[in-house]
């Protein structure tokens, strides 16, 4: 079973038979159905079915000229809201199947963000019309989460918040300059990182890491599109899986200046957001 089926309320699937029934339900009573031509005899087919507000399952495969569907794979999804980043986005096809990943480097985080492309069919149609040189300048991110913990925020004065915002802004400017090959910017970033490492190492001797760090995003595990994150909760609401009746928490987070939504089963969230 896909590891993140749990995040949309299907964590109690016990065997392959139950999973097959769910996939069959998506194929037969879908919310949305899309086709993209592959060749004269075959279309790439995608069935989407929503099981709650913004959460659902995609089933992808091939549809032949006789409308016979050949199943390839399935994946849970969660639709985010708003624009997360206005950085340039590039798209690459996965090696093992007809699925795509997006890559963008936002100066707020300073790393390449790799993500699974949710609107694959729209991308393929645009590529057929406009060729392979499609460029995107914004992206809406969303996250599937299996568990989470609510922490008390780090206490800051107004002056500390203002100073932090200035530091973040200055770092973004340095990162932008470093990308163009500016040696002074590269040197400044290197010295800043060394200074930060030294300060944090000293504080960790007597303080807990969560009293020092209030937001982060970093790769998790060996797969390129999995991350461990911590951020400020800006909005919080509940939805429910229509089949399992499990409550799902939907939270809008501010993570290193990136705004995006995540969904996580309520029973797997430790603590209550204020």
Question: What positions do the PLM features span?
Answer:
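N-terminal alpha-helical "arm" segments
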Residues: 1-40
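Long, hydrophobic alpha/beta structural blocks
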Residues: 38-234
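Short amphipathic beta-strand/extended segments with alternating polar/hydrophobic composition
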Residues: 113-115, 261-266
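Generic recognition of flexible, low-complexity loop/linker segments
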Residues: 217-220, 237-240, 272
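OB-fold (S1/OB) nucleic-acid-binding surfaces
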Residues: 235-262
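Short nucleic-acid-contacting surface segments enriched for D/E, G, S/T with interspersed K/R
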Residues: 267-274
């Amino acid at each position: 079973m896909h590891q993140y089926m749990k995040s949309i309320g299907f964590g109690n699937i016990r065997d392959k038979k139950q999973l097959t029934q769910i996939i069959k339900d998506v194929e037969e009573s879908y919310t949305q159905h899309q086709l993209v031509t592959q060749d004269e005899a075959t279309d790439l087919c995608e069935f989407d079915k929503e099981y709650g507000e913004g959460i659902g399952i995609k089933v992808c495969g091939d549809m032949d000229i006789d409308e016979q569907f050949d199943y390839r794979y399935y994946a849970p999804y969660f639709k985010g809201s708003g624009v997360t980043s206005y950085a340039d986005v590039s798209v690459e096809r996965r090696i093992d199947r007809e699925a795509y990943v997006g890559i963008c480097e936002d100066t707020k985080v300073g790393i390449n963000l790799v993500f699974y492309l949710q609107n694959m069919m729209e991308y393929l149609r645009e590529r057929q019309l406009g060729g392979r040189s499609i460029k995107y300048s914004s992206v809406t991110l969303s996250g599937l989460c299996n568990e989470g913990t609510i922490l008390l925020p780090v206490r800051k004065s107004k002056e500390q918040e203002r100073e932090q915002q200035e530091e973040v802004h200055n770092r973004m400017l340095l990162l932008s300059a470093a990308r163009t090959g500016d040696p002074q910017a590269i040197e400044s970033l290197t010295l800043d990182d060394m200074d930060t490492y030294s300060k944090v190492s000293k504080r960790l001797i007597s303080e807990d890491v969560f009293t020092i760090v209030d937001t982060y995003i970093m790769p998790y595990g060996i797969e390129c599109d999995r991350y461990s994150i911590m951020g400020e909760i800006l909005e919080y609401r509940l939805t429910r899986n229509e089949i399992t009746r499990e409550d799902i928490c939907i939270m809008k987070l501010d993570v290193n200046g990136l705004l995006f939504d995540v969904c996580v089963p309520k029973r797997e969230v430790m603590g209550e957001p204020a």
